């Protein structure tokens, strides 16, 4: 769903994050999603899941809507930070002891994706003071920007422990009793920032753009996008 109720919003994020990000539908108990993670996690609200069904791994490509309160400066303009965009998101519900394995696996997917496009990337683990609310561990994936001559964030992978499952009442039924599941999320690709990374790292002096080999089959075999010449 592209809209979720307030009980789901309060279960997946803090009030401060909600106030800065979410668009509320006036006169309705509904909010536009800032990420499909919220819809995917919210569908399990109040459920008792058989432990044998864990892990539950999901992915979604959806529109996202964000107010982006507080964003300012030249590097925050244009495609970098917009109010509506599309994003590929991954979510996992698992046993607490399996969270590190899934964290490393999902983080690897994002790094592998960008490197398949010949884009230089690095990972930057967030210190405790930089962690967003509810997160236990988080790592940003950053791509190189030739224009800015620095790396910029293109993805993020996080473990949220039982913060979301406790608020939403998502439990697993195991041999030794019921317990709260651990949730994780991973942004594989937000299309605006992905487009910036592809364009900047493949831009040529004559104004043309090289198409990464991995994308050429989806571009009819085309290798170069050339600028239109003035008539």
Q: Which residue stretches match the model-derived regions?
A:
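TRNA-recognition modules of translation machinery and tRNA-sensing kinases, especially anticodon-binding
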Residues: 1-231
